[in-house]
């Protein structure tokens, strides 16, 4: 209860802080907003358990940040990795790991910076993409990928940069399809409809990565991907709306298969036994 009150207080303080900054400088307000946008507001307190205690422990440096994770069945028949969502951890994907190990796969699962067991305070889509690329270069070639939410966005962004073919498999679970949608949602959270401040926010994104926020898009990246893609999304997802996913579905890409569920929402979908089995079988 105390934790929830503290979180509400922090959010209220941030809203006021950004509004005050915007009175004096749209740029400063945008800088603060982007900083908050890149920081997970919660971090899981889970510690390794069960199958994670049996794994090889992985620790390495990513852009000056120590990240930590696990590897099972080294030199397995095929390599797979798991990319968690915002404020989540690979510790939430035990069932996927067990299923992939039963198929004889080598499994690599590492918490992204600022998440779970890894160090760091912030991460953006560009950094998460580069994190996936580093995983592939360090432990790969990795041919099978599972990603939920934020992780589901960064997999296509990474794969379009990685040499790959039709043998690769990508399972996207409720991916954050359009970063522009995520940003719109964020501005609602901070209760801002300041157009000029939002324009400065967009300028900052371009300065950091050289591309506008619309570039960080599954619908854009998927056009450049040869891999087979299984895309699972729920009709009642209030975090990453199905409407964005349906625009991709309408394109009828031959390498993309959709599984649309109802009643699972954004989080329960990746925990659903039928979805897990479908994904493990696909990979």
What are these regions (language model features)?
Residues 96, 227, 241-249:
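Short alpha-helix in the alpha/beta-hydrolase fold that links the catalytic acid
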Residues 162-211:
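Hydrolase active-site cap/lid region
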């Amino acid at each position: 209860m105390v934790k929830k009150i503290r979180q509400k207080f922090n959010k209220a303080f941030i809203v006021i802080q950004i509004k005050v900054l915007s009175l004096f400088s749209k740029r400063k307000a945008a800088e603060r907003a982007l900083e908050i946008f890149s920081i997970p507001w919660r971090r899981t307190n889970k510690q390794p358990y069960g199958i994670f205690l049996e794994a090889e422990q992985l620790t390495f440096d990513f852009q000056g940040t120590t990240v930590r994770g696990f590897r099972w069945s080294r030199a397995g028949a095929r390599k797979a990795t798991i990319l968690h969502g915002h404020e989540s951890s690979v510790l939430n994907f035990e069932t996927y790991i067990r299923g992939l190990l039963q198929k004889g796969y080598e499994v690599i699962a590492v918490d992204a910076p600022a998440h779970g067991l890894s160090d760091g305070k912030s991460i953006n889509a560009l950094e998460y993409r580069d994190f996936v690329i580093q995983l592939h270069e360090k432990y790969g070639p990795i041919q099978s990928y599972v990603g939920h939410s934020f992780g589901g966005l960064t997999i296509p962004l990474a794969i379009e940069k990685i040499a790959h073919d039709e043998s690769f498999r990508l399972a996207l679970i409720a991916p954050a399809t359009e970063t522009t949608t995520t940003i719109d949602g964020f501005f609602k959270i901070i209760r801002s409809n300041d157009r000029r401040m939002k324009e400065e926010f967009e300028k900052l994104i371009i300065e950091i990565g050289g591309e506008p926020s619309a570039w960080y898009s599954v619908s854009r990246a998927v056009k450049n991907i040869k891999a087979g893609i299984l895309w699972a999304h729920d009709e009642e997802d209030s975090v990453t709306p199905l409407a964005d996913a349906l625009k991709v579905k309408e394109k009828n890409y031959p390498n993309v298969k959709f599984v649309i569920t109802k009643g699972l929402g954004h989080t329960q979908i990746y925990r659903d036994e039928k979805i897990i089995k479908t994904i493990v079988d696909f990979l």
